Amino acid sequence: MVAAATARAIELKVGETVCIADEGGFPLLIERMDGARVTGPQIAWNKAFTAAGHRRSTHLFNTPPIGPALPGNEAFGIQWSFEGRFAIFVGGFPIVVDGEVIGGVGLSGGNGEQDTSCALAALQALADALEPRGHSVLVRADIKL
């Protein structure tokens, strides 16, 4: 997954940090590309943590009009939870295999479109590895379980 995400980042000419987290949001692997921001590892981890823990793509928290973290909605202020680790912006995606969230992938370093493209490359790599073995992997930007 990380190799696919970084390969896509190279194609896009952007320095990314990739975090793969388990279902509890704890990092299994963090890789910061040469030249990527030093803040990337923490931000990518926050995104992977949030996506795994809440079983949804992080950008859905603030997507109008019903994003739950928007002012006036039920989860407004949630980004201050978990000592500020709760990410409500683009770049975090749950890893869903056979309908179950098994982890999260977080990207930091590009703009939202670039982070999403790299994350989708990571998810597609997992799908390519697991689908021949009879497993299904959800590969899309807007994931909410």
Residue ranges and their predicted role:
Residues M1-L145:
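Flexible, solvent-exposed loop/hinge segments and secondary-structure transition points
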